[in-house]
Amino acid sequence: MAALAVLRYAGSSPLLWGWGPILFGLLGSVFVLLLPLVGIEEQCCATLKGLALLRCQMWGGIQRPVVHTTSLAVPFTALDLLPQKVKPSKETQLEAKAALQQALEMKKSGKREKAHKLLVHALNMNPEFVEALTELGTILEEEKDVVQADHLYTKALAISPCHEKALVSRDRTLPLVEEIDQRHFGIIDGKVRRLMSIPKGNSALRRVMEETYYHHIYHTVAIEGNTLTLSEIRHIIETRYAVPGKSLQEQNEAIGVDVAMKYINTTLLSRDGAITVNDILEIHRRVLGYADPVEAGRFRVNQVFVGHHIPPHPQDLDKHMQELVQWLNSEETLHLHPVEFAALAHYKLVYVHPFVDGNGRTSRLLMNLILMQASYPPITIRKEQRAEYYAALDTANEGDVRPFIRFIAKCTEMTLDTLLIATTEHAVGLPGASNHACPDCKQTIPVHS
């Protein structure tokens, strides 16, 4: 305790304000390593708890959730606006507390499965019930689901930054989760190296890359409700003629993504230098240029609401976009894994939501631009993953972006696996791909003059 008193006094020194959180992180890690040692577990837990509380007293609580990546906290002021949710009624809160008490009793008597269900029930009634989040995290951690446990601790701290048990638990799980994430990145890197070792002239690789191109257009518009089939999109892109009986708006959406992808491939990828706001505007100008030429390539002028998320006011868009490109070109991003960097860029742009329409398509293209700059293939988020994709974005809006990064990492690995399998001796085409032209497509009127 004397040592803690010295640290408390030292924390008042301006020289330690920058190094203080790092110092506490290192001390916390040391005590985590001591936890398993026989005979000192309680002392270590008590000391770790003291460090966590002291950190809160010296540096204060975080007023709003910050973006937590797998390796680097990247503050971003666009997160100042958080989702506004209706609070549960007093009766519902009391019922949630009763469920928590029952869960604790069940856990004490060894009925862990019942305790788990009761805690889930409590959180269904009150999603921001910090004690229930922390207790469920503890159960998941004991069940070796450390990633989900860490997420629950993080969510609890986003709501109550100085919650004692959540602080101690998060300090314990964070290093383990970072190790898991970095190990997954290592697996992805190995698959990228295997793909890069295939000669560029390989006919199977060329064929599957062409199929992947059309698949990306199909899935990126289908995620947002476009009803065109893969064969119809291929016909539209190759002929620029309309598909009878289909919405011209939907067909122009597909052409816009195609034109934007060609712009990235022929212009941005071959150019040295920083990514600029104008680059993002030019991507969007092409994404929306056929479906809505008036709004293409310009920021929105009205406030929009996306579910519970409230994007920045139109008057603040210039500032937020300048912050975004400053971050995109900062030294901080050099320390991020390419998948992590690309996922964060996607999230930050879609969070600002600078356009009336086409924010998701533009964000996914920006993500792929960053991946391709790092010699990764462009990835596809499949329409079947729509619910998981949006859920990960919602989770990021609540203060923990790591599940979204993991989702993008999974999509990256799926894309790599598809490319590698297609170039093996017994290769097959991509799921849903067809070598046949659209059976009902005939050369009719041009989609866009």
UniProtKB/Swiss-Prot annotation:
EC assignment: 2.7.7.108
List of residues binding ATP: 224, 250-251, 358-360, 364
Chain positions of motif Inhibitory (S/T)XXXE(G/N) motif: 220-225
GO BP field: protein adenylylation
Catalysed conversion reaction: L-tyrosyl-[protein] + ATP = O-(5'-adenylyl)-L-tyrosyl-[protein] + diphosphate; L-threonyl-[protein] + ATP = 3-O-(5'-adenylyl)-L-threonyl-[protein] + diphosphate
Membrane topology annotation: Single-pass membrane protein
A single cellular component GO annotation: membrane
Transmembrane segments: 15-35
Subcellular location, principal: membrane
Keywords from the named record: ATP-binding, Membrane, Nucleotide-binding, Nucleotidyltransferase, Repeat, TPR repeat, Transferase, Transmembrane, Transmembrane helix
Pfam families, per the entry: Fic (PF02661)
Modes of activity regulation: Adenylyltransferase activity is inhibited by the inhibitory helix present at the N-terminus: Glu-224 binds ATP and competes with ATP-binding at Arg-364, thereby preventing adenylyltransferase activity. Activation dissociates ATP-binding from Glu-224, allowing ordered binding of the entire ATP moiety with the alpha-phosphate in an orientation that is productive for accepting an incoming target hydroxyl side chain.
TPR repeat coordinates: 96-129, 130-163
Entry's localization field: Membrane
Gene Ontology terms, MF aspect: AMPylase activity; ATP binding
Family, similarity comment: Belongs to the fic family.
PANTHER family the UniProt entry points to: FIDO DOMAIN-CONTAINING PROTEIN DDB_G0283145 (PTHR13504), PROTEIN ADENYLYLTRANSFERASE FICD (PTHR13504:SF34)
Primary role: Adenylyltransferase that mediates the addition of adenosine 5'-monophosphate (AMP) to specific residues of target proteins.
Domain notes: The fido domain mediates the adenylyltransferase activity.
Protein name: Protein adenylyltransferase FICD
Gene designation per UniProt: ficd
